[in-house]
Amino acid sequence: MSNIIKQLEQEQMKQDVPSFRPGDSVEVKVWVVEGAKKRLQAFEGVVIAIRNRGLHSAFTVRKVSNGEGVERVFQTHSPVVDSINVKRRGAVRRAKLYYLRERSGKAARIKERLNSK
């Protein structure tokens, strides 16, 4: 029974997901439906959390827009997510970067990772 479920989930998973980690700056292009129109919307920010659960994997991206912090959770293998583009690699030593919520300005900066593992 579980082999059938694993096989079905494997078929639905995207194969073109790039490798990224918390601290990386990414641009996520998402399909947005407004009435009868369908368009791509970009959301660019820092990955603060990743939840690896196979087909149900998700990641959280945070950005500051007009002085207000905005976080959005994306399902990695969702058909709504068109593409994920890694803009910059960040050097952090935590898996979850929730401490960035309390920081603003220069205190919220993340150093760039030079060697990409």
Swiss-Prot record:
Entry annotated with the keyword Ribonucleoprotein: yes
An example molecular function term from Gene Ontology annotations: structural constituent of ribosome
SUPFAM superfamilies: Translation proteins SH3-like domain
Keywords for this protein: Ribonucleoprotein, Ribosomal protein
Described function: This protein is located at the 30S-50S ribosomal subunit interface and may play a role in the structure and function of the aminoacyl-tRNA binding site.
Alphabetical list of PANTHER family matching this protein: LARGE RIBOSOMAL SUBUNIT PROTEIN BL19M, RIBOSOMAL PROTEIN L19
Annotated family: Belongs to the bacterial ribosomal protein bL19 family.
Protein name (database record): Large ribosomal subunit protein bL19
Source organism: Photorhabdus laumondii subsp. laumondii (strain DSM 15139 / CIP 105565 / TT01) (Photorhabdus luminescens subsp. laumondii)
